Design a protein with these regions (language model features):
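Helix-to-loop junction immediately C-terminal to a conserved catalytic motif
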Residues: 8-39
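Short, flexible loop segments at the rims of nucleotide/cofactor-binding pockets, characterized by
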Residues: 10-15, 85-89, 120-121
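A generic structural signal for well-ordered alpha-helical segments
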Residues: 14, 55, 77-78, 102, ...
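Glycine-rich, highly charged phosphate/nucleotide-binding loops
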Residues: 16-20, 90-96
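A secondary-structure boundary/capping signal
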Residues: 23, 38, 64-65, 82, ...
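Catalytic core of membrane glycerolipid acyltransferases/transacylases, capturing the structured
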Residues: 29-90
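Non-catalytic C-terminal accessory region of glycerolipid acyltransferases
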Residues: 94-210
Length: 210
């Protein structure tokens, strides 16, 4: 019940904070894939979901830390976005397994490879969870760069400013050359870096991590 209600109410409201969404044609209409975006603000979820869900008319599952389910308002929002709680202290293995199963069933998973919101507005080092999902489920990654979301609602603030964000969507990234090979740390870091560099390009930033 929460999902259909939220689908009608939330996007028109969030639209006031969105300047433009570029590259929607790059988002696959069918099949499983991963949406990977930079994490600049709590507004990131609203902007991504309010743009992609109406466009695709499909539910997108979002991986979120379990603390986002600790009150009724947060719980309603995260239920709408199909969020799966991650216990970061345990490494989030349970949520990753759930996400892999969902991808294998043709679902869409949204994730922020950095793992947490930035304090400065700049990109942080990406964690390998996104690579684990992409290589294990053998699905493409759609990179997204958000520009301006940090200025709307930076970490530590609770009232969004009336500014506008731009969402740049890149072409799906395929990692077929790794399929069939034993997944190792080097491979995971290599794939993660490729994804983060594309997110950096789309968000007009630099990614200086290896």
């Amino acid at each position: 019940m929460v999902y259909p209600i939220g689908k009608r109410i939330i996007p028109p409201i969030v639209k006031f904070w969105i300047k433009q969404a570029n590259g929607l044609q790059n988002v696959p209409k069918k099949g499983a894939f991963i949406v990977a975006a930079n994490h600049a603000s709590y507004m990131d979820h609203f902007i991504i979901m309010s743009t992609l869900v109406p466009y695709l008319d499909r539910k997108i599952h979002h991986l979120a830390k379990k603390e986002h389910f600790d009150n009724i308002f947060k719980k309603i929002w995260h239920t709408w976005v199909g969020a799966v709680p991650i216990d970061r202290e345990s490494g989030g293995k349970e949520a990753l397994m759930w996400a892999i199963k969902a991808l294998n069933q043709g679902e869409i998973i949204a994730i922020h490879p950095e793992g947490t919101r930035t304090l400065t507005g700049k990109l942080q080092k990406g964690k390998v969870g996104v690579a684990i999902l992409a290589l294990t489920a053998k699905v493409p990654v759609v990179p997204i760069g958000l520009i301006g979301a940090f200025e709307i609602l930076p970490k530590g603030k609770y009232i969004p400013k009336m500014r506008k964000a731009t969402m740049n969507i890149g072409k799906p990234m395929a990692f077929g050359k790794y399929y069939g090979k034993k997944i190792n740390k080097r491979m995971l870091r290599e794939v993660t870096t490729r994804i983060m560099k594309e997110i950096a390009r789309l968000s007009k930033q630099k990614y200086n991590f290896k």
